[in-house]
């Protein structure tokens, strides 16, 4: 995983389901943002709560009525993040989830992320130092644990 370990024998096996935000949003372009999130759920009983989450992230009802292909890059990223947060999964993988978002959307996304991942393993790959500091999670830098339990304050730009 990310070059942290080089297996020499055995096998790698995941436990449970994994939710992810990739650098490409991988949304269904013909569906609305809400419909894209509902795809990961067994039914639509959570639609009102999903709409509230979108409101917290700054997407209004007009944006939610558009097909995903007409959303801005930042709106697509917020949709992908919400879909991963709502997806049933034991582990969350986030690859540059805040790319293309304005600062207010990043802060709102970080606040929601912190609330929703309590006790859930998260692997976040980002170059966004402000986001790392705001999250305050343990961090790996240059393949070493930089500071357990809190974000690192070093100025080294070689994050992996």
Regions found by a protein language model. Give the residues of each.
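Walker B catalytic motif
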Residues: 67, 96-97
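Hydrophobic anchor residue at the start of the ABC signature
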Residues: 81
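Helix-to-loop junction immediately C-terminal to a conserved catalytic motif
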Residues: 2
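Conserved ABC ATPase signature
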Residues: 67-71, 75
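Q-loop/switch helix immediately C-terminal to the Walker
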Residues: 24, 30-45, 49
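ABC-family nucleotide-binding domains
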Residues: 95, 102
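Conserved signature/switch motifs of ABC ATPase nucleotide-binding domains
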Residues: 87-88, 118
């Amino acid at each position: 995983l990310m070059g942290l370990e080089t297996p020499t024998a055995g096998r790698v096996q995941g436990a449970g389901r994994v939710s992810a935000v990739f650098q490409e949003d991988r949304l269904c372009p013909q569906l609305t943002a809400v419909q894209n999130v509902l795809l990961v759920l067994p039914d639509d009983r959570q639609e009102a709560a999903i709409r509230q989450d979108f409101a917290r992230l700054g997407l209004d009802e007009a944006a939610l009525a558009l097909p995903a292909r007409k959303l801005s890059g930042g709106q697509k990223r917020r949709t992908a993040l919400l879909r991963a947060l709502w997806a049933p999964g034991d582990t969350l993988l986030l690859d540059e989830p805040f790319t293309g978002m304005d600062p207010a959307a990043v802060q709102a996304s970080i606040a929601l992320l912190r609330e929703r991942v309590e006790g859930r393993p998260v692997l976040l790959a980002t170059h966004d130092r402000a986001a790392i500091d705001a999250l305050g999670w343990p961090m790996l830098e240059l393949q070493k644990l930089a500071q357990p339990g809190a974000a690192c304050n070093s100025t080294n730009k070689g994050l992996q």
